[in-house]
Regions:
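Active-site groove signature of glycoside hydrolases
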Residues: 35-47, 93-124, 236-243
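Short, acidic/polar
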Residues: 13-31, 84-100, 151-163, 182-185, ...
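Boundary/entry segment of secreted carbohydrate-active catalytic domains
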Residues: 1-29, 34-35, 40, 77-79, ...
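Structural preference for beta-strand elements that scaffold enzyme active sites
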Residues: 2-8, 35-38, 70-74, 103-107, ...
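Glycoside hydrolase catalytic-domain groove-lining segments
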Residues: 56, 132, 136, 140-142, ...
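Substrate-binding cleft of secreted/luminal carbohydrate-active enzymes
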Residues: 174-181, 189, 198-260
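Aromatic-lined carbohydrate-recognition surfaces of secreted/lumenal glycan-active proteins
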Residues: 7-13, 67, 71-86, 124-158, ...
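Active-site-adjacent "subsite" loops/lids of carbohydrate-active enzymes
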Residues: 1-19, 58-64, 72-101, 105, ...
Length: 260
């Protein structure tokens, strides 16, 4: 399998406005040698605004145009799971959306911290189990994307591990923007995820600013170049970047000129 490169999309409508519509977005994805775009489709049990109202038809069109151009569209959900019933309901919401929009894969964007995953180990198990059943029924790949060093968040590791147990791929958020180097951050993530056996496929910092973002557009481009080469050197099956709307032009230029 050739190495794949993906890009997250958080808020689709402003991205489409900036790019000039669905066709232009897909052209840009192709130029950047993206194998897939990863679009937020649900927050908890609620479908996200990228797939509701008038955006539902737009999302359908996006998937159709992407598939016509050999680009996959994966969806991602931020689970909250305050109860086991809620956990099952959230997974069922995701399953319905994945089926309706013919998504190529499903990503559990399960993160530690008060504003993200509310449940305990039982809720984590209920969510992971129901998601695995959904992915199997739909014959979709299932990814886990979370904080790249789960041990850093008090009490998160057991729940993280329980959810990840049901995934096919691990997409750790290696936001290296303020780290001493790209490699140092990836190495910490490798250590933090060493207990998992699924493929490690890191998420790079494709944005400028706080929360692990890069210091400047130029730094974003330079670090992306290092990150891509590191993924090649270590033979990771895939890698991705957070996120489309935050990616400076300098990063797109790297993607346009660097094979995946």
């Amino acid at each position: 399998m050739s190495r794949s490169r993906s890009m997250y999309i958080w808020k689709l409508e402003p991205v489409l406005a900036a790019e000039g519509g669905v066709n232009k977005l897909i052209e840009k994805a192709r130029r950047a040698k993206l194998s897939a775009i990863w679009v937020k489709v649900a927050d908890g049990a609620s479908p996200y605004r990228n797939v509701t109202g008038a955006m539902a038809a737009t999302m359908t069109n996006l998937v159709t145009r992407a598939h016509d151009n050999n680009v996959q569209v994966w969806g991602w959900q931020v689970p909250h799971c305050p109860t086991t019933q809620a956990a099952q309901d959230e997974a069922e919401t995701f399953r319905t959306l994945a089926q309706r929009f013919q998504l190529d894969g499903m990503i559990m964007d399960a993160e530690g911290g008060a504003e993200f995953f509310h449940g305990g180990i039982n809720e984590a198990r209920a969510y992971g189990t129901t998601m695995r059943q959904a992915a199997d029924a739909l014959q979709k790949s299932l990814g886990m994307s979370s904080n790249d060093i789960p041990q850093n968040i008090t009490g998160w590791l057991p729940r993280f591990t329980e959810i990840a147990r049901h995934a096919d791929f691990n997409f750790p958020q290696t936001y290296y923007g303020s780290s001493p180097s790209v490699a140092s951050r990836i190495d910490r993530a490798v250590n933090g995820n060493a207990h998992l056996t699924i493929p490690f496929a890191p998420v790079g910092a494709g944005y400028v600013g706080d929360g692990g973002g890069c210091a400047s557009a130029q730094a974003c481009a330079e670090r992306a170049t290092i990150f891509i080469q590191l993924c090649k050197d270590r033979d990771y099956p895939s890698y991705s970047f957070w996120h489309w709307a935050g990616a400076p032009m300098a990063l797109w230029e790297v993607l346009n000129t660097t094979p995946a």
